[in-house]
């Protein structure tokens, strides 16, 4: 019989990462209300981007939650040479800068090379390191030395405990503003799964933890015969989000699209824009319930 559970269990807590947005700051922490990292997979035609932004604005003016707009200027890691990649660095950053100033949303976008770090940091409020590149030391260094907050996705083949070394790598380059993102784990060929305990384990590192719901729903490499697009199961967006939010995390990362079947990239994983209001409302409700409970007591493995 355990007489003193505090001797075996520790309160689960995290540091805070403050995003200095164009109109207000957003504090990202596992103890704060959930933040939404929301938008398109890649910058598409302006009409598609505008439709997405208008609905995001409508939904979040109603629900009063913090939102960060995300979109890529270049999908550099597509499987096929036929896959659409986006507008590229110069045009893409110009469009993201317009979105930031016109809609007043903080911007999250990813980079793939060291040379992109400085120009991306001039526009983006959070720099994202893609999962496949999360161990690239030169890329981590270039991103860290911009002194911008970093959103680092856990590679699909890594164990959660391996992410501690990546946090330490960022810290060694002078950047302690790190958010770790779970985006699913490889489970055989063409399949990803979410292990909720991965989120709980990474919370021991005392940094904010996010869940990339959309890409955890992906079927890599099995979307079509030509392998131009990945498959996915976006109809499970809310159940998977619930699994992550129940762990008391800082943010959810969700891609949406007005017509997912016509999306340039990962349309099978994208939440239909028409479902955004419903999904956001239910995520907020569960997050409030979870964070209203006493601090979770989690055994630290020795």
Language-model segments: residues:
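N-terminal amphipathic alpha-helix/helix-capping segment at the start of soluble metabolic enzymes
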Residues: 2-36, 94, 290-302
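Structural preference for beta-strand elements that scaffold enzyme active sites
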Residues: 33-37, 66-70, 106-108, 125-126, ...
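Glycine-rich, proline-tolerant flexible connector loops at the mouths of alpha/beta enzymes
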Residues: 36-49, 67-89, 256-266
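Glycine-rich anion/phosphate-binding loops
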Residues: 42-56, 87-94, 231-239
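Alpha-helix-loop-beta-strand connector modules within alpha/beta enzyme cores
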Residues: 54-58, 62-63, 82-108, 143-149, ...
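Active-site-adjacent loop and "lid" segments of alpha/beta metabolic enzymes
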Residues: 82-90, 128-133, 192-193, 217-246, ...
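Catalytic beta/alpha-barrel core
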Residues: 86-88, 102-116, 125-139, 148-160, ...
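Catalytic alpha/beta core domains of metabolic enzymes, predominantly
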Residues: 146-256
């Amino acid at each position: 019989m355990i007489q003193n559970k505090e001797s075996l269990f520790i309160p689960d807590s995290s540091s805070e990462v403050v995003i200095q947005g164009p109109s207000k700051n957003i504090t990202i922490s596992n103890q704060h209300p959930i933040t939404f990292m929301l938008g398109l997979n890649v910058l598409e035609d302006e009409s598609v981007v505008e439709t997405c932004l208008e609905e995001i604005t409508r939904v979040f003016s109603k629900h009063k939650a913090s939102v960060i707009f995300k979109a890529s200027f270049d999908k550099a890691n597509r499987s096929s040479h036929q896959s659409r990649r986006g507008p590229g660095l110069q045009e893409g950053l110009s469009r993201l800068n317009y979105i930031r100033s016109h809609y007043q949303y903080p911007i999250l976008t990813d980079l793939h090379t060291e040379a992109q770090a400085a120009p991306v940091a001039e526009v983006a409020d959070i720099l994202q390191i893609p999962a496949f590149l999360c161990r690239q030391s030169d890329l981590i260094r270039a991103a860290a030395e911009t002194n911008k907050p970093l959103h680092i996705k856990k590679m699909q083949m890594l164990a959660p405990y391996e992410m501690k070394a990546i946090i330490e790598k960022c810290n060694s380059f002078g950047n302690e503003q790190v958010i770790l993102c779970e985006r699913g784990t490889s489970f055989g060929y063409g399949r990803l799964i979410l292990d909720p305990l991965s989120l709980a384990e990474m919370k021991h590192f005392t940094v904010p933890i996010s869940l990339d719901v959309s890409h955890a729903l992906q079927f890599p490499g099995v979307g079509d015969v030509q392998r131009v697009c990945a498959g996915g199961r976006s109809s499970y967006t809310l159940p998977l989000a619930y699994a992550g939010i129940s762990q008391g995390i800082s943010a959810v990362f969700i891609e949406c699209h007005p017509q997912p079947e016509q999306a340039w990239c990962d349309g099978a994983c994208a939440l239909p824009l028409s479902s955004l209001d419903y999904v956001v409302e239910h995520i907020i409700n569960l997050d409030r319930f979870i964070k209203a409970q006493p601090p979770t007591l989690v055994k630290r493995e020795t």
